[in-house]
């Protein structure tokens, strides 16, 4: 991984802020973000060589429930992770994972933005036991290897009896539980699939004395 630069984004929209999930198209230009207040943001990154210098064609709107109904309750709006499942961010399908009212939805995305979900993944009963602040924090679709096309979702800090992180993988629609070893008390905050079938997991830890650490 190489640091290319950063941007400070501002908007007068009341829906702007609290961005908790981000996905880029394969060319690294089109992006989609989702927020913990139930909004989506799309746009195109502008580069100077390899360094991002701005955003254009930005659009913002609310995530919706089935049949394009509004998400009225706060606990229904807390989107924490997003990934591209099919196509592109201009014409494709995305998966959005929510905390609070734990669920993972399939949404269509086009040049007009994000429509309401077509369906939700069937979750294992155990996932309903996650507390509101320890639910899904990462979702991705594996791009290669034996489980190419499988959906993987990881919880922030829902742990088993041995203290390991809990997640699930959907292979041909069938759920399987998996665990990640907890090393150093870090929480899971995002994940991204690699072309070879691997997965990069981003973790963070906060302490009043040490501040925020990420790896």
What do these predicted ranges mean?
Residues 1-215:
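Sequence/structural signature of beta-propeller domains
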